[in-house]
Structures are given as C-alpha cells and as structure tokens.
Amino acid sequence: MTAIKGKLQELGAYVDEELPDYIMVMVANKKSQKQMTDDLSLFLGSNTTRFTTWLQGVLDKLRSVTPESNSMKTSDAIIFESSMPSLKSLSNSRDDLAKDVPTLTVSSTRHGRYDSSTSSHVQATGSSGSVARLTSAVKPLREFSPSEAVIDIKLDLDDPFNEDLSLATEIANLSRKRTALSASYRTLRPTAEVYRPPGIGQHAYHTNENNSSLHRFPQSSFVSGRSLKLQSSMTVGSSRIQDVSDLSETYKTAFRLASEKSLREEETSRKRRLPVASSVVKVKKLITDEEEVEEEGEEDEEGTDCIFRTAGISSSVSVPAKPERRPSLPPTKQANKNLILKAISEAQDCISKTTNYSTAAPQKQTVPVIPRSRLLPEEEQLMLLQNRSSLLNYPSHLQELQHQAMPEPLHKLDLLSRLQPNLEEEIELPNPVNSEEAEILRPLDSRSFILKRPKLSKEPSPQIQNNSVSPPCPAQPLPGRMIQPREAPTYEKPASPKFIVTLDGVPSPPGYISDQEVDESMCYTEQGETCVEQLGVVARPEQNYPMQLVTEPLCTNDVVMENTSSGTKEKIRERCKYWPACKNADSCAYHHPTSPCKSFPNCRFADKCFFIHPNCKYDAKCKKADCPFTHASKRFPVPPVKPVSTTSSSHPSSQPCRYFPACKKTDCSFYHPKHCRFNTQCTRPDCKFYHPAVSVPARHTLKWTRAQASD
C-alpha cells in the first residue's frame, strides 16, 4: 500500500486514500493490466500506462518469489490472511516481521463513511530481493477469544465464479465510496470531543505513528448481525460450490444487502451532520493518538453487534444542565460591581431624601375673578362696619395724615390679613344689595391675575385705630383715565404692599408689583398706593369696598392725562427724507431703513424704498431725479425735465426722411421705410416695403467692427 501511494505521489496523482484502496481492490480481484488501464485512465490520465506497467511488474515479481513448498497456496495466487493481533502486540509483530524478511504487507480495514471499505498499508520491499508476501489483515481493538473462528479466505485462479464475485465486490465497494466521499477529507483536521452522559456508545480512532498506519473503527464499519452471518456464510474455501443457481442467488442477495446498507449509511451520515442541541463541544488539538468521538444513533440490533461500545443503555438520552450565561464582553470592558452598587445606593438616598421648601418664598397662584359670588354673612357684616367707621372718622388735618403715612403700611397689612381669613382661598366678591346697582357695577372683564404671597410681619400688630382706614376717594374720574401727581414725592418710596384692583371693584390679595405694572383702573398717589376707581358711580356706605389711606387729597388743578396703552408712538409708514443724516435717530416718526435692499438696482421704489441702497458717488451733485442710490447730502433742486412729445415717439411722422437711407439719427422723427427682406430679389410688383437701388450685401459677408470712440 505504501509503495502504491508513493508511486502515485511521484506521478502527481495522489489525492486521498480512495485511489490506493481502489487499486488494491482491483489487485485483489485479479484485474488484468488492460482492465486496470481502462479503469484508472480517468484518474491517472497520461500516466495510466506507466503506472499499470509498474504495478504489473511488481505483482509478477511477487508471484515469482512465492514459496512453492506451501501446499495450500499456489504460485500465482495472492494470499489473504486474516490475522488479528491486539494493539499491545502490534509494535512487536512489526519488529518481528522486519527482522525476518522485508515484506510488502497489505492491511485491509473497513472505514465506513470516512474512507473506502478497505484501508491498506503497503511496506515497500528492500533491494535485497528477499521473499515478500501479500497479506490482508483485519486489526480490531481487542483480540478474539479462542472460541471464535478465524476465517482464511483463499481464492483459486481456476475458479469460474471469481469474476462474478469480483464484480459483486467491486459494486459494493463503489457504493460505499459514494456515501463516504463527503466525509473522506475530515480525517486529518482537529477533532471535536462531544460530551455525553455515561451509557452512550463512543468510538475512537487511533493513529499509531510507529506503525505508520491509521486504524479507524467507526460504528458504521460494523454491520448488523444478519449481514455478518450472511457474509460469513459465503466463504470460499477449498471446497467448490456445486450449485450455480444457489450461488447466483447468494450474490444477488449480497448485492441487495450492500445497497441497503449504503442507503442506511447515507441516512446515518445525514443525521450525524445535524447540530446537536444537548451536547457541549470542546475542540482539542491533535495528539499522537487521534480521537474522534461521534454521536451514534443506530438501531438496537446494530448496537448489540458493536463490539467496541461501552456498557450501558444505548437508547437513553441525558441532557446536561443549562450552562450559566456568561457575558460576551471581556472582563476589562465589563462594569465594575462596586460602581453599580454605589450608584444604586446613591439613587436610593436621593429618593429617600425629602426637600423642605421655605414657607417664606414667594408663591404664585392664579386667582380667578368670580363677580357674582357671595361672602359669608360674618365677613359681610365686618366689612360693612369697617367701611362705616372709616367714613365717620375721616381726619381733618393733612399733617396728621402725613405723620402717620410711614407706619401705615404695616397696619393696613395686618388689617387686611385679618379681614381675609385664608389667602390661599379664592377671593369672593359680595353680591350687591340692589339689582340696579348690580347692573351698573357688572364687571366688564373677568381676567385672572398671578399674585405673589407677601411676607407677613412676625411682630404682633397693635390695636388698629379708627383713622387707620382710608376714606373713599372724593374725586371720581372718568374710566380709562389716569391721574398723576403734579410733584414727585420728596421721600423714598416705602416697600409697602400694593394691591391690584379690577374694574369691578374686586379686592385682590396683597402682592409685590413693580413700577412698570400699570393698570388702567389704578389711581396713583404719592406713596404709590391705589384707590378704587368706580365707573361713574358714587361710592355709598353700604357698598363693601376696601379703602386705603390717601396722604394727599386730590385737587381740582391736578393734571388729567389720557392714558396711552402703547409706550411708543407708531411710526409713519414713510421713509425719512433726511435719512441717513436725520438727527432724531430712533425718535423720528418716520421710517429709517436698517437692512439692505435685495432687489437693488432693479428696485422700483428708488429713494422711497424702506431698505438701504448703496450711496451715490455724486451725492448732492447728482442731477438724476430717479437715481436709485442713496444721497446723504441735500441735493440742489433739479430743473424740470422738458417733456418729450409723445406724438413723435409713439406716432412717427408720415413725412419721409429726406436723408433716408443715409440717415444716421437714431431718434429721427421722420418716416423711414422698412426694408424688404428679399431685397432686389423680390418678385411682388405691389410690395409695400423699401427696395434699395443698390443691392445690400448678404449678411454673412458683413463683418461687424467696434466703432472707435471720438475724443
């Protein structure tokens, strides 16, 4: 076998173990040189004749040196010995053979779907020319017991049934080769060790480097008991088979069984290629004894005939526990557990904390105005008594009021805080007593105000005197007007609480307002405090309106000014004619451009455009009336332009020009006849166009030149 492999490598035709095995099968079947040449021409090509000649010479030499003394063997027969040494004595037997004679050993084993049915190892004979013999040995993993029979198969050359037997064997081998073709290239790669629970059959493939041979024992290399018994019954010994028909039936049965076996092996190999979900696979590197563990799912009958299976129930399935999920990121990129725990603890602390907000902070609340709501009876009576007492005890001297002006805000604040039980509740308006007054005092708007809670004084308020309540405003100005004092206050404005009063007289909670907050219904005094404006109705004692202190009585010589809602006067929609030299700047009532004009120079508004045009380089000296550029300086009056007569331009004179066709005046007002396009080639006798006496040259012959500018 080694010699054949070496020769194939020399010829460059060695690919795998299939071809040497096929050649050994042909040698065993006693193929002639011509038959070998025909069969191997597909694989070897032009080297077929050279190889078959060499192989035939080797076989002839082996036949010639076969010893004649053996009576059980003929000189031209190939000897098939079935010797079964153990794995332990394998190296010793090889050493013994090497000591005796250099022999050419052919070892045949079955490989199932990985190789062909026969795996041979050929040891080349030495140059000494000593005797060599061809043997076929089946080497299992264990020794047979003495009770088991050893079958020696010897074929006679004169047997007429050798050709039929060779044909059946070749067909069976070829069918096994087809099924094993897909897996024949997986013998030399790293193997995968599949973990299974105990009880599942395992098979190992061992490589013995000392013997330079590979022994494979997959489960597919063993057939069922019926096949073994049937093939064992077809032994060809020294006794001839007499009945030809029985032998033919036996060959047909063997062929059919071989075909069925090949189909089973195909199905088994297909199932083995499917992924196994319950197996943990660990890839191992190649070692000296190559081991390949496969999951076998054969029938129970085949499992009982397998001599290499371990003890246990082959049909039991054990699924290993689900492995713990491991993170896909490397340890360096994984989150630190301490950081995660720290973040969780901080989050819990943040959630557990309660924020204490200061009660003194100003709070905003929206107070809807409810014009037709009623106060409680007790509050109604209290406010009525306060208003009556304030009217009866009005102070007569202005000096006393001025001395009491400074401490007054605190008293008013305490009074109003006591009059209003809860500032957080909505302010309610007392219902007027008479229906006529209700119709007169009906509010004109129902706006809501955003108010701020004032900081109440912590000191106990003194007893409120009668003069601490302000009287009603004696003057009732018209609605929509604002009364301003003639003189500015001589002292700094105190930080007193102020009140926002709506047009319908609804009292609002105290709050801080800025100087810019101006309401149309407010009447400002020196201290900036407000008093109620009523819509042309004289205040009566029975009406419940809160009054405030007025430090200076209103006089008739107060200036009454119109209240303007907008702070700035709207500009006139016309461009300032003095821009950009206008001295009023932003206070100018006219429009001053601020952005460049996008339609310049095609802007049709000229100097009236609301956008900036570039400056005119002539500025004040510009004489063009409709100049689109900007003129910063004042221009001199432009003399009126003499109007052009429209009759000459729109309706030219019917009198022909006497200089035609030599007239060079572009704006000539006389009649210039139109040239005929056909010129002198015109054939119409009644053509109304002009036909020059001298023919005008063609257009393509004329050359246009630029006229030289005259100095």
Curated annotation (Swiss-Prot):
Subcellular location field: Nucleus speckle
One biological process term in Gene Ontology: mRNA stabilization
UniProt cross-references to Gene3D superfamilies, sorted A to Z: 4.10.1000.30, 4.10.1000.40
Superkingdom, taxonomy of origin: Eukaryota
GO cellular component, one term: nuclear speck
SMART domains: ZnF_C3H1
InterPro entries the record matches: Nab2/ZC3H14 (IPR040366), Znf_CCCH (IPR000571)
Region (Disordered): 108-127, 457-478
Pfam families (alphabetical): zf-CCCH_2 (PF14608)
GO MF annotations, alphabetized: poly(A) binding; pre-mRNA binding; zinc ion binding
Keyword vocabulary terms for this entry: Metal-binding, Nucleus, Repeat, RNA-binding, Zinc, Zinc-finger
Zinc fingers classed as C3H1-type: ranges: 570-595, 596-615, 616-631, 657-674, 676-694
Biased composition (Polar residues): 460-470
Family indicated by similarity: Belongs to the ZC3H14 family.
Assembly and binders: Homodimer; facilitating circular RNAs (circRNAs) formation.
Primary role: RNA-binding protein involved in the biogenesis of circular RNAs (circRNAs), which are produced by back-splicing circularization of pre-mRNAs. Acts by binding to both exon-intron boundary and 3'-UTR of pre-mRNAs to promote circRNA biogenesis through dimerization and the association with the spliceosome. Also binds the poly(A) tail of mRNAs; controlling poly(A) length.
Protein name, UniProt field: Zinc finger CCCH domain-containing protein 14
Natural source organism: Xenopus laevis (African clawed frog)
